[in-house]
Amino acid sequence: MAKPAAKTKKKIKRVVTDGVAHVHASFNNTIVTITDRQGNALSWATSGGAGFRGSRKSTPFAAQVAAEKAGRAALDYGVKSLEVRIKGPGPGRESAVRSLNNVGYKITNIIDVTPIPHNGCRPPKKRRV
């Protein structure tokens, strides 16, 4: 006897007017995630996922392309304004914020949430080239 076909629920697109853009800019890559106020992810993109490999991933242009990609995907949810939270010392910090502004979002505020140790772990030794 054949099993009946499983019914799939239609995914409901929720409407979110204001969101939060989390920009994680490391030295090697840039990750841009756009969430709602509760932290549920709406869209995300990375420099590596945007087609950049190797040392080109860590450029400001790669961060710009990744932020545009994540921003355009979040437009489907009706996001109009963004609060930007930047974490990390990477080269794509400013360019990601600029490109989110160019996509058409109203940037309400920009917060730097880079974790700063109170003299925690010992840093890695210096490179000798």
Swiss-Prot record:
The keyword Ribonucleoprotein applies. The keyword Transport does not apply. Transmembrane segments: none annotated. It comes from the Bacteria. GO terms for cellular component: ribonucleoprotein complex; ribosome. InterPro entries: Ribosomal_uS11, Ribosomal_uS11_bac-type, Ribosomal_uS11_CS, Ribosomal_uS11_sf. NCBIfam families: PRK05309.1 (NF003698), uS11_bact (TIGR03632). Part of the 30S ribosomal subunit. Interacts with proteins S7 and S18. Binds to IF-3. Located on the platform of the 30S subunit, it bridges several disparate RNA helices of the 16S rRNA. Forms part of the Shine-Dalgarno cleft in the 70S ribosome. This is Small ribosomal subunit protein uS11. The lineage of its organism: Bacteria, Pseudomonadati, Pseudomonadota, Gammaproteobacteria, Lysobacterales. The gene is rpsK.
